From Swiss-Prot:
The keyword Ribonucleoprotein does not apply. The lineage of its organism: Bacteria, Bacillati, Bacillota, Bacilli, Bacillales. It is found in: Cytoplasm. ATP binds at G81, N142, R167. This is tRNA(Met) cytidine acetate ligase. GO terms for biological process: tRNA modification. One of its GO terms (molecular function) is ATP binding. It holds the Pfam family HIGH_NTase1. Its EC number is 6.3.4.-. Catalyzes the formation of N(4)-acetylcytidine (ac(4)C) at the wobble position of elongator tRNA(Met), using acetate and ATP as substrates. First activates an acetate ion to form acetyladenylate (Ac-AMP) and then transfers the acetyl group to tRNA to form ac(4)C34. It catalyses: cytidine(34) in elongator tRNA(Met) + acetate + ATP = N(4)-acetylcytidine(34) in elongator tRNA(Met) + AMP + diphosphate. It is an enzyme of class 6 (ligase). Keywords: ATP-binding, Cytoplasm, Ligase, Nucleotide-binding, RNA-binding, tRNA processing, tRNA-binding. GO terms for cellular component: cytoplasm.
Length: 393
């Protein structure tokens, strides 16, 4: 956050945040409301939600949804972390892909026909068409997402400028901590769910407010969220589904339903199920997203109705600082999308999916807290934060 503000000289900062389930196809550690508090305490001025229909998707769709929201909010610059760290290289790679589009598409098809996943086939195709050092490594996850952010900016004819900050010391999938007080999300999650987990172990790697809120959530609700806690629900659901039922679920393609129903029979944990399920053709992340759609019963028809090829249909406001509130007041007449401060009286196919996802997310919380959380989610007004006193209002 500090580097972003230094690089962009921004007046305010806006974060577009996933709801209960993430782009990797797994539940968020804590609720979006707690994560909103974390963001505000770390210097973000406006926190808005990326709907489930965009947030649990491949990088292209995820980026398209996020950029459409930022564009509607009249954001002038976007800043993202990447393994490359040079924004010119992203634009150059996009230019090369456009000029070599026919060759690129042929190579992707060729590598997929050889049994590779779409992600692997795309990465290999880029290796073949990119030769200059001024191109980015498209096998790296943050480079891929940044590439899609810029493509979305260009496709939406936005005047938004892009900046990138180089990630260092810790890579996206690193599972261990290093001695530079920088850790990946993967390593933090692994530590939190280890046998002798302790918040003390992760405190040097995250902001003080984040550590405090993580501990508070676990104390208040008795848990942090990960896939294993949903596995019994997930397995029960699959045991009651037919191949035909599964084929209606979003991202279940090419006979994957038969493999899923076969592997679930002997799996005793989500991790063992994923180990049995994964193949050269299907990446772990791709399969996790499919599993998320099974868990939330998100169908192909529902995603079709959400019209994800277009922009996000609304802006769900989760939190704001005083500066953020001032920005919205000054610009609300220019913002074309409806801004939702609660969802009790609003209806939309995309929001219907979000409500289901929230219900599933809180299913592991004990009653009566679970029902309270579900009711609050629809009526919850944006969290307000006074940045001068560092207190929530």
């Amino acid at each position: 956050m500090q580097q972003t503000k230094k690089l962009t000289h921004s007046d305010i900062t806006i974060a577009v945040m996933s709801g209960p389930f993430l782009q990797r196809g797994e539940p968020a550690l804590v609720s979006k409301w707690y994560r909103t508090k974390m963001a505000l305490a770390c210097g973000v001025d406006l926190v808005v939600e990326l709907p489930y229909a965009f947030s649990t998707q491949k990088a292209e769709t995820f980026a398209n949804g996020a950029i459409s929201i930022l564009n509607a909010l009249h954001v002038s610059e976007i800043c993202f972390g990447s393994e490359d760290g040079q924004i010119e290289n992203f634009y150059n790679t996009i230019s090369v892909q456009k000029n070599e589009e026919e060759t690129f598409n042929r190579l992707v098809k060729q590598f997929m026909n050889a049994g590779n996943s779409y992600a692997k086939a795309t990465s290999e195709a880029f290796l073949h068409i990119l030769s200059s050092e001024k191109n980015i490594d498209m096998s790296q996850p943050n480079n891929i997402l940044g590439f899609q952010y810029i493509k979305a900016i260009l496709m939406q004819n936005s005047s938004m400028q892009a900046q990138t900050i180089k990630r260092f010391a810790s890579h996206y999938h690193d599972e261990t901590f290093n001695d530079q007080h920088i850790a990946s999300a993967t390593s933090i999650r692994k530590q939190l769910f280890s046998e002798n987990s302790s918040f003390t172990e992760i405190e040097p790697f995250i902001p003080k407010a984040t550590a405090s809120l993580l501990a508070s959530y676990k104390q208040n609700y008795g848990t942090l969220h990960n896939w294993e806690q949903y596995f019994s629900f997930f397995k029960y659901k699959l045991m009651t589904m037919s191949p035909e039922d599964l084929r209606h679920i979003y991202e279940i393609e090419e006979g994957l339903e038969h493999r899923i129903l076969s592997k679930i029979q002997t799996s005793s944990s989500f991790h063992s199920f994923m180990e049995a399920l994964k193949t050269k053709r299907y990446t772990w992340t791709r399969l996790q997203r499919a599993c998320t759609h099974i868990l939330t019963n998100t169908t192909k028809e529902e995603i079709h109705c959400a019209n994800i090829e277009q922009h996000a249909p609304y802006i769900r406001l989760l939190g704001m600082s005083q500066k953020g509130q001032t920005y919205l007041s000054k610009n609300k007449k220019k913002i074309e999308l409806p801004i939702l401060t609660h969802t009790k009286t609003f209806d939309h196919p995309t929001l219907h999916i979000d409500r289901k996802a929230n219900s599933v997310y809180f299913s592991i919380i004990q009653e009566p807290l679970r029902t309270q959380l579900l009711k609050q989610d629809a009526t919850h007004h944006p969290i307000r934060y006074d940045e001068t006193t560092a207190k929530f209002l």
